[in-house]
């Protein structure tokens, strides 16, 4: 499985999360994952909630359409974006 996989209308993305960063951003490829930096600390699910909010803005979709499938408690995550309205350029170039 690559960094980004398209399944019907959804995208499945493997992420490496950098919490407590200076700003929210999609950094780029990181091995076989996509590195995403977020400002929230990894405490009490704050980083996951912030990640979902940030990605929802990037894909112009509702927060409920960003699902963490694997890695709820770690830096390595697999997320599903349900029917994104827009795909950020940093991610669209990684779609096979």
Swiss-Prot record:
Q: Which GO terms describe its cellular component?
A: cytoplasm
Cross-referenced Pfam families: DUF167
Give the family per the record.
Answer: Belongs to the UPF0235 family.
The protein's name is: UPF0235 protein Shew_1134
């Amino acid at each position: 499985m690559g960094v980004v996989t398209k399944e019907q209308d959804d995208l499945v993305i493997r992420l490496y999360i950098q919490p407590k960063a200076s700003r929210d951003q999609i950094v780029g490829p990181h091995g076989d994952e996509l590195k995403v930096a977020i400002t929230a600390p990894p405490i009490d699910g704050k980083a996951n909630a912030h990640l979902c909010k940030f990605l929802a803005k990037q894909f112009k979709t509702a927060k409920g359409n960003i699902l963490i499938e694997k890695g709820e408690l770690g830096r390595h995550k697999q997320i599903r974006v349900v029917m994104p309205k827009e795909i950020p350029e940093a991610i669209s170039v990684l779609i096979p």
